[in-house]
């Protein structure tokens, strides 16, 4: 049943969100992975629709350029890995490529990821570290893909893409998880509606 619901959700026939419910959708899609969302919860839900593969786990001391880009502190040691979401286990075409940074005190997250594939990484990190995420900052930008990312998508280097940098903070303003995601151009859109209050 869960696989059937996940498949229908991937096809855009309805959407399921935790603590929100299920909503039937009627929307024409051009291209297998065109997705449109109008809230932040939807973006996290989007990533969790697809199977993930963890690659290239490494310990890294942040240089100034990387720390500045991710909103972290230069010289800090982090554990970085690739979180690749694919269309399905049968069709392992990449949907999104994400570089995730966690701190050494959250190392156990890497073991939990294998056992709890439906849980978001921030959920696992909260459980392991005892920190509670109270704020998420997201920065969207149009950019080009570095070669190691374009190779995963099987497109030329410097192909256009959407980059999303996310920072998950606790109540003290300390980072729990930071990530940098790449989506292929024209496969993802994010819209915001503002309403004037009287």
Model-identified regions with their sequence ranges:
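C-terminal all-alpha effector/ligand-binding and dimerization domain
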Residues: 50-198
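Short, charge-rich binding segments
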Residues: 14-15, 45, 71-74
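A generic structural motif
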Residues: 18, 28, 58-61
């Amino acid at each position: 049943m869960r696989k059937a619901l996940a498949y229908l959700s991937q096809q855009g026939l309805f959407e399921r969100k935790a603590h929100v419910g299920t909503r039937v959708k009627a929307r024409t899609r051009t291209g297998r992975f065109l997705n449109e969302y109008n809230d932040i919860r939807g973006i996290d839900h989007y990533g969790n629709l697809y199977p993930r593969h963890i690659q290239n786990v490494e310990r890294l001391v942040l240089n100034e350029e990387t720390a500045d880009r991710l909103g972290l502190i230069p010289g800090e040691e982090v554990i970085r890995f690739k979180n690749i979401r694919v269309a399905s286990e049968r069709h392992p075409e990449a949907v999104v490529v994400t570089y995730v940074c966690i701190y050494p005190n959250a190392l156990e997250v890497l073991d939990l990821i294998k056992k709890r594939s439906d849980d978001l990484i921030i959920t696992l990190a909260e459980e392991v570290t005892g920190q509670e995420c109270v704020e998420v900052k997201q920065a969207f930008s149009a950019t080009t893909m570095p070669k190691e990312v374009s190779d995963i998508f099987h497109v030329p280097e410097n192909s256009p893409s959407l980059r999303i940098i996310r920072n998950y903070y606790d109540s003290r303003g300390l980072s729990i998880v930071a990530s940098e995601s790449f989506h292929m151009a024209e496969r993802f859109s994010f819209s915001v509606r503002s309403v004037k209050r009287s």
